[in-house]
Regions:
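Aromatic-lined carbohydrate-binding/catalytic grooves of carbohydrate-active enzymes
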Residues: 281-416, 425-429, 439-441
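Short Pro-Gly-centered flexible turn/kink motifs
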Residues: 236-255, 679-686
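Polysaccharide-binding surfaces and accessory modules of carbohydrate-active proteins
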Residues: 24-222, 232, 655-658, 663
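Glycine-rich, aromatic-flanked loop segments that form ligand/cofactor-binding clefts
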Residues: 51-72, 192-209, 256-276, 312, ...
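Conserved, mostly hydrophobic/aromatic
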Residues: 116, 241, 319, 368, ...
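Bacterial N-terminal signal peptides
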Residues: 8-19
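C-terminal beta-strand-rich structural cap/linker in extracellular carbohydrate-active enzymes
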Residues: 665-689
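Active-site-proximal substrate-binding groove within the catalytic cores of carbohydrate-active enzymes
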Residues: 41, 58-63, 246, 436, ...
């Protein structure tokens, strides 16, 4: 085998391998048989260079008939405490099309990231046709003994019990696997974190940053695996002066690690480098929320829910007002949640004055802030029904029901509208939903020589909407729903938390399917999406196994979903005591999700016949928790789990969910044996004694 090379170092040593300079040219990532192969984070010994995208220009592969020159962007080389970066451009010989590649190498992690933008430098003429554009095209060398490689992924969110279950594809020599999401929402089909395993301890994770339709191809040639990642459909010319962005891709190496160890490292990378931070640079923590539907019949119902929480000293830190609070004056029925009209008035962001006579939500917002909680409000800014008043003067602001974020005037209008509501109500958590598939709209809009442009402009506009909001309200938390977990990708995770990771949790479901999904989503998804959660209303009161299957780094409960609790009836003393017990423990667990996440089992699927377990450890606090589930049909009565971050010669105080405590040695805690009855769990908190 060849010496170990990082993707960037390979380019330094063999620049003619770049796809910009040769037909179907490849960059070689060399895998080492001794276990330490893979990407090497750039440092003084491995200077940062670039890997060019691949595409056709006017029907010819870039680097053959169409010549492109390359250049460093002056002043682009920069370094921070977390990463080093630089930018380069490649420009067509016709002087029109220019591709800019922004590269970033992360310190302390085997990770490199590529962000791509295309510009027409001409002020008078369109470019030639760019097609089959791939933000990343490279070749990964395989071990000499390997004839097959494995691609591990998670299914996306489709409101089914099988959301986020693992899938594994074996790619034999001479075969390929193509994954894509075609509807326009990034995690509808697959979660775009694609794990290529070269053997049991080495491989690469490709994390796609694109909140639209992406496509990834993995082809095993026998000696290497060719990897191509980009938008699903591209065949366009750029208009004079026009700029668009393309998917970003993060490449993260697994070097001599088990897959569980690798997921712990990647989770740490996400916390250190990707999750949203406030104006002081601090990670914005996950939330524990109590919710009221926006479609309540009177504002007093919202106030009653808040008062219930205050009187019973519930540990919630956020008050959540969901859909249904907006639209032309109308009276809602006494529904327990959002009411029957929540979808009818989307796009009309006037407060419903029949329910809220003041014409705003200040009575509840002010009361929430007075009680010391954060105020969350639901929006769906990208969709607009026929009820929207703006359509009378600006019908061009939407296409179908999709607000045209590629139209600067439409984008400014929705920004001014939503930002104004945020300012008036001092909103702490902005919740963004998106309940449509935009892909068909984009395909209808695109001309034959502009395929992909409507999508690219909409996605860029959506990022600008969120980024401008962050600049204006630097301490706001953005939350990303999209019909429950259908827009989970690297770009959105860097901007928002997700507290409705699947809509399958809404309402009671057959047997334990919702609770198994809860376990799966936390174990399988948290390495990529550290701050997540879902609705609690699928949980029967008093069912601890169900409750802690659902509780994650964040959780939300709507009390009225429990047979109209608070709104239509008083919650009983027993119900209140159980809610308080569960959520006091959830609040205790929450800070540990800010530390190291250790999967204690491999990814679990939808079956009821396995154990599921994970651990959250805070090295800075010398404490953490671990939780273990024996599902209903699991045959093993006991399991021994290897916990992470435990000091073998230390003493630990261990406290179980039932309140029992004992002191154990680190070696015992590190190899923790759990004996459980079917359909039961054990939750243990530990700290150095």
């Amino acid at each position: 085998m060849k010496p170990i090379l990082s993707l960037l170092t390979a380019l330094l040593l063999a620049p003619l391998a770049m796809s910009a300079f040769g037909a179907e040219a490849k960059t070689s990532l060399v895998h080492s048989p001794n276990g330490d192969g893979g990407l090497i984070a750039s440092d003084q010994n491995h200077p940062l260079k670039v890997c060019w995208p691949a595409f056709d220009y006017d029907g010819k592969a870039v680097g053959t008939e169409a010549a492109f020159s390359t250049a460093m962007v002056a002043g682009s080389q920069a370094a921070t405490a977390h990463h080093a970066g630089e930018s380069r451009t490649m420009t067509a010989a016709d002087g029109k099309m220019q591709v800019r590649l922004d590269c970033r190498s992360y310190k302390g992690f085997p990770a490199e990231e590529y962000d791509v933008r295309l510009t027409n430098l001409s002020k008078t003429e369109p470019t030639g046709i760019t097609s089959n554009f791939r933000s990343l095209k490279l070749s990964v060398g395989t071990p000499e003994s390997a004839r097959a490689v494995t691609l591990n992924v998670l299914r996306g969110s489709t409101c089914k019990a099988t959301d986020f279950i693992p899938e594994s594809f074996t790619i034999e020599a001479g075969k390929e696997r193509v994954l894509t999401t075609t509807c326009g929402r990034s995690s509808n089909d697959y979660v775009p974190f694609l794990e290529l395993n070269l053997d049991d301890r080495n491989g690469y994770l490709f994390a796609v940053g694109w909140t639209g339709s992406w496509k990834a191809r993995f082809a095993n040639t026998g000696n290497a695996v060719e990897v191509e990642i980009g938008m699903e459909r591209t065949h366009f010319r750029l208009m004079p002066g026009e700029t668009i962005r393309q998917p970003s891709v993060l490449v993260f190496a697994r070097k001599n690690q088990t897959r569980r160890e690798f997921k712990t490292l990647f989770h740490r990378f996400m916390l250190d480098n990707k999750v949203p931070r406030d104006s002081k640079g601090r990670v914005i923590p996950p939330i524990l929320a109590v919710a009221s539907g926006g479609g309540n019949k009177t504002p007093q119902m919202m106030a009653d829910i808040l008062q219930y929480c205050v009187e019973n000293k519930m540990p919630f830190d956020t008050y959540w007002v969901d859909a249904g609070w907006y639209g032309a004056p109308h009276e809602d029925e006494l529904f327990s949640n959002c009411g029957p009209n929540w979808g009818k008035y989307v796009g009309d962001w006037r407060v419903n004055t029949t329910t809220h006579p003041t014409g705003d939500l200040l009575p509840i917002a002010n009361a929430v802030h007075k009680a010391g909680l954060k105020f969350l409000l639901w929006f769906e800014p990208e969709r607009m029904t026929d009820s929207a008043p703006i359509l009378k003067t600006h019908p061009d602001y939407r296409r179908g029901q999709l607000v045209d974020y590629g139209n600067p005037d439409a984008l400014k209008w929705i920004q001014d509208t939503i930002y104004g509501i945020i300012t008036k109500h001092r909103i702490d958590v902005y919740r963004q939903d998106f309940n449509m598939d935009p892909g068909p709209v984009w395909r209808t809009v695109d001309a034959a020589d502009r395929v992909g442009i409507a999508e690219a402009k909409h996605i860029a506009g959506m990022y600008r909407f969120l980024d401008d909001m962050r600049a204006r309200f630097p301490d706001i938390l953005q939350e990303n729903c999209a019909s429950g977990g259908r827009r989970i990708d690297m770009e959105m995770i860097a901007r928002a938390h997700t507290y409705c990771r699947s809509d399958y949790y809404i309402g009671r479901k057959p047997k334990d399917t919702a609770f198994i999904l809860g376990q799966n989503a936390t174990l399988n998804l948290i390495p990529y999406l550290p701050f997540q959660g879902c609705e609690f209303n699928c949980v029967p009161v008093g069912d601890d196994y169900a409750a802690f299957s659902i509780v994650s780094s964040g959780t939300v409960i709507t009390p009225s979903d429990f047979n109209g609790g608070i709104i239509r009836r008083k919650l009983t003393t027993d119900e209140t005591a159980w809610f308080k017990k569960v959520f006091d423990v959830a609040a205790r667990m929450k800070p540990f999700y800010m530390g190291d996440f250790h999967p204690l089992a491999d990814e679990t699927g939808a079956g009821d016949d396995v154990w599921c377990a994970w651990q959250c450890d805070r090295p800075d606090l010398k404490s953490g928790f671990a939780i273990f589930f024996r599902r209903g049909a699991a045959k093993e009565e006991s399991r021994t789990f290897e916990l992470g971050g435990i000091t073998p010669n230390a003493k630990y105080e261990v406290e179980c969910y039932d309140g029992s405590k004992k002191t154990v040695g680190g070696s015992e805690l590190r190899n923790w044996t759990v004996e459980l009855k079917p359909r039961s769990f054990q939750l243990v908190f530990y700290r150095v004694y």
